Amino acid sequence: SFDHNTEPSSRKVDYLEIVTPDFIHVPATEKDAEAVAWMTAHVNSTLAELGFTVSTGRVVDFRFREMLHNDYFDGAVPMVNASHLRGGIVRHPIGTKKPEWFHSDPESMVKFVVPGGSYVLIKRFSAKEEKRRIVSAVWCSEGSVAFDNKLNYIHKDGHGLDPEIAAGLAVFLNSTRVDEYFRVFSGHTQVNATDLRMMRFPRLEQLRALAKHVVAEQQDIDSVVEQVLASEEACE
């Protein structure tokens, strides 16, 4: 807000910086404009163009309490929720109060679980202590798994991704570049599947290059993303 004594400010922005084929950006500051410009220059594929799909986890905990269990037993599959994503890694089980296993009749199992494989998980709601809006990690398993409704997951036709591609996607999504870009066009803390469908992602060869440098520290993640996506070789 401004008082009557505040000098108003204005910015001239090129039309193409605001209106794109996918949505309208509002780069209110120079930092916003730079975030959009960088992403536009170095990233140009949608998930659909890469052959991938993003969906929301199928299990709504309060609706399926009878299918959720605190302890493992024969036939149960992992029930993965947002609390299992920590530091770019999915840790399961971790001994939380929330049920960590899912089991039901065969018909429901087919409906609510996904086959084993590598999936990129993204929290739909970021926690207060998390600095980034988008928090991502890779889940990898041989057996089936159930994902909580508070998670989005990237897959290929309902099955897992190439593990290398999944790792590259997680590195990209956890970068500061993506966080700054996401904040330009999304004013809320929720990350919807629709938002992810509209975003731009690196090409497959770039994702494989990112996967060779899987790191945990934010500074290292950002350095790798800059190195791979902004390099002349990656942009050829």
Regions found by a protein language model. Give the residues of each.
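A short, terminal or domain-edge coil/loop segment
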Residues: 3, 235-236
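Polybasic, glycine- and aromatic-enriched phosphate-binding surface used to engage nucleic acids
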Residues: 31-234
